[in-house]
Amino acid sequence: MLVQNSAFAQSVNEIRFKLKKLVKISATIAPLKYNKKLAFSFTLDDGYRSAYTCAYPLLNGGRVSPPIPDEYKSDSGGDGELSAGLYYTNGCGERVPFRLAVALNAGIVYDRPDNRARLSWSEVEKLYDSGWDILNHGYHHLSKHGTDYNSEVLANIRFVRQKLGFTMTQFVVPGGDHDPGYEHDYEKDAFAAGSFTVASYVGAGPAINVGRPLKPTQLIYARDLLSSYKDSVSLSSVDWQLAKIDSMMQSPQPIWYNAFTHNAGNRNLWTISLLYPEFKYLMTSLYERYGQKGNDKLWMAPTQEVYEYLWMRDHAKITIEQHGKDVTIKVRVSKLPPSFRNTALTLIVDSKSKFYLVKSSLQSKISDNGNSAHNLINFSIR
């Protein structure tokens, strides 16, 4: 189980390195982690089993499940093929797997029957421990007239914390039959419960310019629904989506894009899901064009990871001290929320000299490309 950050105070961290040539240097915090061009957060809503049987092994590497006829008369499986994984790099020679989020209803997570269509608790835990985000989607996915929205929000937080030991801090409004404006009640109650973001019907995005500070602190954002047409595989519809992403890559500003679907197996569950062949084509195309195999400008990361990076970026202050070839960079972050899971930052170093790290007050691993492109340092705040 990954342990969450528990500090809630100003954090001062030092990174010291030595230049190989005497030159003047400067440094700034990258707009996006690893200095990528586009952050793409893709969420699988409702906690369907295909997140673990299909999406996870495709992205992380492993055997994708063969067809699994399930209790909904659908199919929670894929093509049964072995995947080597889909990756981008951290800009310093290390590869990072594509990761998604699951919007979870804890009240409908179960281990039986064998042909279940939903995730089990052990599967949710595995996804979380592999760096996927688990988002609050309400305890029972209720939206109809008479729903106690506050109870739905809080019960889901409490039950997931009880079962797995972490606190969900991102909310996704559940869809379905509803009263007009019900989403605003969910938004209000989610923020009151400590959520930092809410995915709703209307808000920022789905493509958000993050070249400037992210405002407001409590972010309501919209997402694109990606779904197949009935049970007919159409790769041309995925090509249209890829063209949309390509246009975002051409933006002069860094972009954070949010999209979602439901099931990712072999059947189009509720006609609001993405058939596995289309899901696979989308993800492998992203890898080949914008991941490690392509131009490596894509940060394929889930909502919480991206939001927390942007928060850290907007609240961090850096100072640089240089004495000849010796450089010290101090990074200060005040009032780091105790529920933050990710405290990573990327520094863009403007230097005409290669460099090597000498010392750091950070307890986490630091990566840099000081001996090659000499322009990036990745680290996490204590």
Language model region names:
Residues N13-L32, G194-G211, W256-S339, T343-G370:
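C-terminal domain-boundary segment and adjacent tail
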Residues D75-G80, S227-Q250:
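A Trp-anchored, charged/polar loop motif used as the substrate-binding/catalytic surface
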Residues D46-S50, A106-D111, I134, Y139-K144, ...:
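Solvent-exposed loop/turn segments at secondary-structure junctions
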Residues S367-R382:
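C-terminal beta-strand-rich structural cap/linker in extracellular carbohydrate-active enzymes
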Residues E14-S130, F159-H178, K335:
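Active-site beta->alpha N-cap acidic-glycine motif
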Residues M1-A7:
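C-terminal segment of classical bacterial N-terminal signal peptides
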Residues D114-N115, H141-D239, E278, W311:
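Catalytic domains of cell-wall/extracellular-matrix polysaccharide-remodeling enzymes
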Residues A39-T43, R99-L104, D133-G138, T167-V173, ...:
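Structural recognition of the beta-strand scaffold that forms the well-ordered cores
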